[in-house]
Design a protein with these regions (language model features):
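Aromatic-lined substrate-binding rim segments of carbohydrate-active enzymes
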Residues: 56-127, 172-199, 214
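Boundary/entry segment of secreted carbohydrate-active catalytic domains
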Residues: 22-69, 74
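Conserved, mostly hydrophobic/aromatic
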Residues: 63, 71, 99, 145, ...
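Glycoside hydrolase catalytic-domain groove-lining segments
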Residues: 176-179, 184, 191-278, 329-334
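Substrate-binding cleft of secreted/luminal carbohydrate-active enzymes
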Residues: 156, 262-341
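Hydrophobic faces of well-ordered beta-strands that scaffold small-molecule active sites
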Residues: 39-43, 71-73, 106-110, 156-160, ...
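N-terminal Sec-pathway targeting helices
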Residues: 1-20
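Active-site cleft segment of glycoside hydrolase catalytic domains centered on the general acid/base Glu
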Residues: 81-84, 119-195, 202, 207-209, ...
């Protein structure tokens, strides 16, 4: 056997060993299950209205009937500043006041990309501005929000943008190209309010979370188990995540070790992810990616990740199913969980 062949074999063996070690680290074993888990929900006024619901009724039901004590509020810039320099905060004021009245803790999402399609919610008037002018207006908007609410005790965290490092959604061309803008946003928030930890969210499945950890005080991640894999406009397929619960735990350990940051789940799938917007497909199609059994499975899966904070994505859909489809099963299942929390 020649020397070159021996070297090649040794190299291949080393590669296999490294691959096996990586696989074992991220997929083999069990996480230490947290003794005290916090459960919350993500809430979007826009989403409730898209579903044809009364958003105030829905919000109050979340607090008073479900008994939720932790809410992440998704706000849309185009709703707040539909007219340039004319801010409308009445609806957000109401949401935060209701939370404060009931001792509910709020995570406030601020920025241009704040969740729910089309992800970036830029006002129509912004399109006539240059890229730099658009960035300046985003910072002005953030400043208005933080100064308005920084003295409100209901808010426990600012989340700057929603998955800003994950290229998904309809956003201005500069949004993902300017690698420093997110840091400018975070620096601005910290300069206005240094008392609250800042969350930067990232894809739980398609990222190592390191870039978010460099900027954030707390890393927020997503956790989606049953989704539609969109290949083209006319073709795709349903897929179930192959990730082990311990994958999230081990990634969180790396973030803690190298960056000293905690990781929390700010989006735990609890609504359908269908081939089209879920309210445009039949209930039978919706049930392929979310139903009471999948909901319970996702809760048990989440517990096994070792994380101790989870916010459900889909509470508006639960209420829609309960009040318009006579299907309160997930709402009632969640209610039992929140009563224990």
């Amino acid at each position: 056997m020649s020397k070159i062949v021996k070297i090649l074999i040794c190299f291949l063996v080393a590669v296999v060993i490294v691959i096996m070690a990586i696989f074992c680290y991220f997929f083999v074993g069990r996480a230490v299950i947290a003794e005290d888990i916090t459960w919350g929900v993500d809430f979007s006024q826009m989403q409730t209205e898209v579903l044809g619901l009364n958003w105030k009724e829905t919000y109050l039901a979340i607090i008073n009937d479900l008994g939720v004590k932790n809410i992440k509020i998704h706000t849309q810039w185009d709703w707040i500043e539909g007219k340039k320099d004319d801010y409308y905060f009445n609806d957000i004021d109401w949401q935060i006041q209701q939370a404060k009245n009931k001792g509910v803790k709020i995570i406030y999402v601020v920025g241009i990309k704040s969740g729910r399609w089309p992800e970036c919610h830029a006002p129509a008037w912004m399109t006539s501005l240059s890229d730099q002018q658009q960035k300046d207006k985003v910072l002005e908007y953030i400043k208005e929000v933080v100064l308005r609410y920084k003295d409100n005790g209901a808010i426990i965290n600012w989340q700057v943008e929603n998955e800003p490092l994950f290229k998904f959604g309809e956003c201005p061309a500069w949004y993902y190209d300017d690698g420093e803008f997110l840091e400018k946003e975070v620096q601005l928030v910290k300069s206005l309010d240094s008392s609250r930890p800042i969350i930067i969210s990232d894809s739980g499945e398609q990222s190592n979370w390191f870039e978010a950890a460099k900027i954030a005080d707390v890393v927020g991640i997503t956790m989606y188990r049953e989704v539609w894999a969109h290949i083209t406009d006319g073709w795709g397929f349903y897929i179930k995540s192959f990730l082990s619960p311990v994958t999230y735990w081990r990634k969180a350990l790396l973030v803690k070790k190298f960056f000293g940051k905690d990781v929390m789940c700010i989006e735990l799938q609890a609504e359908p992810w269908a081939s089209r917007t879920f309210y445009d497909v039949p209930l039978a199609e919706q049930a392929k990616t979310m139903n009471p059994d999948i909901f319970r499975q996702n809760i048990e899966y989440a517990k096994k990740t070792g994380l101790d904070k989870f916010y459900f994505w889909g509470v508006e859909w639960w209420y829609w199913m309960k009040t318009t489809q006579n299907s309160p099963e997930i709402w009632n299942e969640a209610k039992k969980l929140f009563q224990q929390n």
